[in-house]
Amino acid sequence: MAMPDSRLRSGIALANLRAMPTLAIVFGLILEAMGIGAYFLSGAQSVTALIPSFFGSVILLSGVVGLLIPKARMHVMHVAALVGLLGTLGGLGMGLPKISGLIAGTLERPTAVIMQIAMGVVCLVFLALCVKSFVDARILKKYSK
């Protein structure tokens, strides 16, 4: 497999380095908004409604640090990916088993289940983008030698 010329490679590498911290900030803000929205819209105002915000805060902070401190970018993006993995497992792991009750309308707190599934899906998309970025970075590193 031949890689494009070095100018294109360096452009791709530069775009890749800037893209993941920016995506982390965007996904962090989405999770923050989900948690705050669930907290105020659910009526119960339980601290557990803020769980997406907790995940979002770590991902958002990782993105900001990744942009501001280039030498730490790889490490903080791996932290963000780990948080994305935990959010995926927690959100989908807790929400999907309750989906039949959600469809049947028998759940006591349907908003909580919807938010669990939504958080899991958002974290899954973020995690997939992280994995793609890590693979792209490894390929670029391999061909830049």
Regions found by a protein language model. Give the residues of each.
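Individual transmembrane alpha-helices with interfacial aromatic-anchor signatures
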Residues: 107-128, 132
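Canonical alpha-helical transmembrane segments
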Residues: 57-71
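Cytosolic juxtamembrane helix at the C-terminal end of the final transmembrane segment
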Residues: 130-145
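Residues within membrane-spanning alpha-helices of integral membrane proteins
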Residues: 21, 25-28, 49, 56, ...
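Cytosolic juxtamembrane helix and N-cap/initiation of the first transmembrane helix
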Residues: 2-28
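Transmembrane alpha-helix entry/boundary detector in multi-pass membrane proteins
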Residues: 17-23, 27, 34-57
